[in-house]
Amino acid sequence: MKAGVFKTKEEVTSDIVKEQLVSVKELTTLKYRYTNVVSFENDNEFYGMKIPFTTKKFIISYDGEVSAGIDLDKAKVDINDEKKAINISLPQAKILSHQIDEDSLTIFDEKESIFNQLKIKDFSEFRKNEMKKTEQELLEKGFLEEASKKSKDAIIEILNINPLIKDEYTVKVN
């Protein structure tokens, strides 16, 4: 029997392409590392006036990292064999994670009053607010738009690993 007599035709289907993408799940395409030095101050008030000797405050430094990308479970794949085209619709990029490195926390100044003591709740709420503020600043600077652009480029690279796709199909990502 000659080799190649029963040669099978390889073909690209939307299921194969979708499986190749979904196996990745989440695609992180952009990371932002930062260091912040921020202060917290709180006084007890009585009818809008600060009460003396009730100030609590701290100054803290920390490192953080924000990751953005896309959820590939929500990608839609359409293959046109006649035109040899693969069209992929991606969801909008989103912030996938935001973490503060607990080992990087440094407290420079800490002051509390016997009448207004620092509590873990103060730090916890402060941390949440600072994280939201950082995320908002990134959104205003186009962080997610950049993550979307990099996601599109990464998807094309991932699919072009398959020689059949690279040689025979045009990949378009929306």
State what each model feature region is.
Residues 1-174:
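Domain-level marker for long, solvent-exposed, non-transmembrane regions
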